[in-house]
């Protein structure tokens, strides 16, 4: 209830939350570095909570061709460098998914234009707050196993700060981003489900705490 939320807030967030004239009055997304949301990662069974350390670790692993898991707005995603054949092949092994195409998270709209054909309507959809996956005709290849035998590519743009922070540290134009579950299994939503399905298959899993 609102009382529980109130008790867990820092003084600054609490003041915004209870002041009727404040634009954040009883707003669900009231947040700060103290109250969260916050990320943590499990790496070699060690819990890492420093955000800069999390970013540096995940960026290094992605550069090295590893597959990582990260919780999105809903469930987990499996992520790798979309240019790395080694990484995408490894992702297919983890997913047990031979031929189905993967969706790709691009750095920005300029890089989308480098790899696919897009018109104004499609770009407007890509840039909208909903950040949908838009199926577009491919212009040039990323790793060939991203969408084997296909002439189209599922494209989307960053919709979380974590995505933009990754691209600031990486030189790749795009990351493969697919649901964090093994084929025929339901999508992983909780850390426990991610651990059960992905243990031993990936080096690190990122989880955010969006709610108190």
What are these regions (language model features)?
Residues 2-6, 211-212:
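Short, small-residue-biased leader/transition segments that mark boundaries at the very start
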Residues 27:
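Flanking scaffold residues of small Cys/His-coordinated metal-binding clusters
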Residues 8, 30:
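Cys/His-enriched microdomains
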Residues 12, 34:
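Short, cysteine/histidine-rich loop/knuckle motifs that typically chelate Zn2+
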Residues 17, 39:
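Cys/His-rich microdomains that often coordinate metals
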């Amino acid at each position: 209830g609102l009382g529980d939320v109130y008790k867990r807030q820092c003084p600054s967030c609490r003041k915004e939350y209870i002041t009727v004239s404040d634009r954040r009055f009883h707003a669900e997304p009231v947040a700060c570095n103290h109250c969260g949301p916050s990320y943590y990662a499990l790496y070699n069974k060690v819990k890492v909570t420093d955000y800069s350390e999390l970013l540096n670790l995940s960026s290094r692993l992605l550069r090295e061709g590893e597959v990582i898991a990260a919780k999105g707005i809903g469930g987990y995603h499996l992520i790798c460098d979309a240019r790395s054949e080694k990484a995408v092949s490894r992702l297919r092994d983890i997913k047990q998914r031979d031929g189905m195409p993967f969706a790709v998270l691009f750095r920005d709209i300029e890089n989308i234009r480098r790899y696919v054909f897009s018109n104004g309507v499609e770009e407007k959809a890509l840039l909208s707050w909903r950040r949908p996956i838009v199926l577009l005709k491919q212009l040039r290849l990323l790793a060939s196993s991203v969408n084997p035998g296909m002439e189209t590519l599922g494209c989307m743009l960053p919709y979380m700060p974590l995505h933009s922070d990754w691209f600031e540290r990486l030189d790749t134009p795009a990351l493969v981003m697919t649901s964090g579950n093994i084929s025929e299994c339901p999508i992983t939503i909780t850390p426990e489900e991610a651990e059960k399905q992905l243990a031993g298959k990936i080096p690190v899993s990122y989880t955010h705490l969006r709610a108190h």
